[in-house]
Amino acid sequence: FTTNRNLNEMEFSMKSVKGLLFIIASFILTLLTWMNTSPQFMIPGLALTSLSLTFILATRLPLLESWFHGLEKVYTVHKFTAFLSIILLIFHNFSMGGLWGSRLAAQFGNLAIYIFASIILVAYLGKYIQYEAWRWIHRLVYLAYILGLFHIYMIMGNRLLTFNLLSFLVGSYALLGLLAGFYIIFLY
């Protein structure tokens, strides 16, 4: 016995294979890279990848739209990666505590998490807020992303500033996320 909803979910997954493979491959690559270099940072590493993907998915790029078979489906995955990001960040915040890095790095990280959590709350309250106000508040996530990048690079230091697979992966996702965020905020 199959319902319409089950059929729609199957249709989403069957038509969106390229897009879903892109997301899954990004997470697998992230997991494998962090497992082989600094396994204790896998959770925040996945959070960075997820946040970067969230920005990339919000760009409305025609390529992504074709991979997911429609903008609506791209935004469904965008919401999922945003939610996954905040869950991973909260888990990271509780599991790492104040164990690593400087006090300033920790403050950047905490501030970023508070901004992310606030914006997720605003996103879910969006239907009660005028669209223009919601859109500008939602853009503050870019500030949180930048603070999070400062946090990461202050904590990881030389591991991310020397050329290796980890620095290439983190740098690539960070740069793609920054470029996507800039594009979203300033160019459309």
Walk through the language-model features, giving the residues of each:
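Extreme N-terminal basic, low-complexity initiation segments
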Residues: 2-6
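Membrane-embedded alpha-helical bundles that constitute the cytochrome b-like, heme-associated redox core
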Residues: 7-188
